Amino acid sequence: MRTSQYLLSTLKETPADAEVISHQLMLRAGMIRKLASGLYTWLPTGLRVLKKVENIVREEMNNAGAIEVSMPVVQPADLWQESGRWEQYGPELLRFVDRGERPFVLGPTHEEVITDLVRNELSSYKQLPLNFFQIQTKFRDEVRPRFGVMRSREFLMKDAYSFHTSQESLQETYDAMYAAYSRIFSRMGLDFRAVQADTGSIGGNASHEFQVLAQSGEDDIVFSDVSDYAANIELAEAIAPQTPRAAATQEMTLVDTPNAKTIAELVEQFNLPIEKTVKTLLVKAAKDSKSTLVALLVRGDHELNEVKAEKLPHVASPLTFATEEEIRAVINAGPGSLGPVNMPIPVIIDRTVAAMSDFAAGANIDGKHYFGINWDRDVATPVVADIRNVVAGDPSPDGQGTLLIKRGIEVGHIFQLGTKYSEALKASVQGEDGRNQILTMGCYGIGVTRVVAAAIEQNFDERGIVWPDAIAPFQVAILPMNMHKSFRVQELAEKLYSELRAQGIEVLMDDRKERPGVMFADMELIGIPHTIVIGDRNLDNDDIEYKYRRSGKKSLIKTGDIVDYLVKAIKG
């Protein structure tokens, strides 16, 4: 490809509305342009990267035995009503009616459509297992699209759905998809972790996320410094303290704390170690509970894990925090003065709180706290559960090493759905025993557009993108200096351009009438891995300057050797 026949569209300045580095660089490198909120046009450079990601995904899905299909983006509402998700999915589901007043949705996912297909096409256990995949546009009406294509409303996704007559068969395909995803992200040159995860709104049993490590990531991922253990922070178990609870050394005293409405204020004003404080959070109770609210207690320096809390049988789902008005109606005190002593509603404490002694907590009286509280002496030990987020340095749940926490960007997610959708849509086949058997399902997604952004978040420097070789828009950039004035520079550039293309190498030759500084800046911004610079001065010695984008290392290579050198560097 020649720049004179190409839409380069690079920008010198960073657009003001681009928050994260991937959004900034995708705009500056001429990869995307915003059409409307959460909607982007992919320009040639961006599309080349997107297609490379798509091709790797498709190859590995085919290698894993999945079968490609293509399903409509527009889906009839009755399928979503049949599955129960019409009411559950919320405003992210874009709903509309056609000219015949028939309701439809723009598909955010395709569980209903594929299950409908299978229930109409399959009839016998002999046809299973089958794993269908597509690479298709999705639409989710995000309340606040942000970070460019990282969280857009329209996006490209690879979604796969497998169907089985047994859990054992599902597990085999699940393991195959886990391995395929690991190969996909390894081939792309990404630093990633596969982590245990919550199943969320999709539902089902087992689940793993594939997270690309990046400082800008929205997810906290947890992994052992010794073993292979890794989990999303929502799911990571906080191990109970192994040391026995210390004996009480203080009497419980009621202390006036009129200006301490937060743990931070309490610690600062009374010079308390934060590890000796407890915070109390009130949430809505489950419908069958005798109380309207439940109190959840975590140590002052710990954070409540809302996913864990929501799974407690005493707690309403979805998790809903009580308003100050609701709290005062039950406790007669504000949120900053709550604690376990004389608490008139059910109390659940974290494992770490259960191991505390001589601690401070609200007295359930405005402007007052109890200091020196001890379990069983001052208040009976309530229900104990794991309800906090783990922190760095906690013991690993598998008993090997301690936990590290890093930020991650979710680029893939695999689920064991079980029979959630097949039961709702009555997808069944005749089993081996001749009886009707509801199918067991798996679901496997990769955010193809998100992978592009995540790769940039992990691969950039002050000059621009530093693409992993496998997904770079071009493999080689040829920069002929003053080619329009130097015949030998132009002649060699054309020769190398043809020879490299004949070797199957993707080349971008910058044949613009531009200053060298602009040419260098654009190629580094775009992130092409290999650059060769052809200039009269080096040609006097029969040399070409070669530069590897990732290391920045430059070297002089003889003109007769450069093609073989690049072929070896790229193809091995």
Curated annotation (Swiss-Prot):
Localization, per the record, is: Cytoplasm
Recorded GO CC terms: cytosol
State whether keyword Lipid biosynthesis applies: no
Q: What is a biological process (GO) this protein takes part in?
A: prolyl-tRNA aminoacylation
InterPro entries from the UniProt entry: aa-tRNA-synt_IIb (IPR002314), aa-tRNA-synth_II (IPR006195), aa-tRNA-synth_II/BPL/LPL (IPR045864), Anticodon-bd (IPR004154), Anticodon-bd_dom_sf (IPR036621), Pro-tRNA-ligase_IIa (IPR002316), Pro-tRNA-synth_IIa_bac-type (IPR004500), Pro-tRNA-Synthase_IIa_type1 (IPR023717)
Any one GO molecular-function label of the UniProt entry: aminoacyl-tRNA deacylase activity
Alphabetized UniProt keyword annotations: Aminoacyl-tRNA synthetase, ATP-binding, Cytoplasm, Ligase, Nucleotide-binding, Protein biosynthesis
Task: Tell me which Pfam families the record gives.
Answer: HGTP_anticodon, tRNA-synt_2b, tRNA_edit
Q: Which reaction does it catalyse?
A: tRNA(Pro) + L-proline + ATP = L-prolyl-tRNA(Pro) + AMP + diphosphate
Keyword check for Cytoplasm: yes
* UniProt-listed CDD domains: ProRS-INS, ProRS_anticodon_short, ProRS_core_prok
The record's listing under Gene3D superfamilies reads: Anticodon-binding domain, Bira Bifunctional Protein, Domain 2, YbaK/aminoacyl-tRNA synthetase-associated domain
Q: What is its EC number?
A: 6.1.1.15
Query: Its biological function?
Result: Catalyzes the attachment of proline to tRNA(Pro) in a two-step reaction: proline is first activated by ATP to form Pro-AMP and then transferred to the acceptor end of tRNA(Pro). As ProRS can inadvertently accommodate and process non-cognate amino acids such as alanine and cysteine, to avoid such errors it has two additional distinct editing activities against alanine. One activity is designated as 'pretransfer' editing and involves the tRNA(Pro)-independent hydrolysis of activated Ala-AMP.
Q: Into which family does the record put it?
A: Belongs to the class-II aminoacyl-tRNA synthetase family. ProS type 1 subfamily.
Q: What is this protein called?
A: Proline--tRNA ligase
The organism that produces this protein has a lineage beginning with: Bacteria, Pseudomonadati, Pseudomonadota, Gammaproteobacteria, Enterobacterales
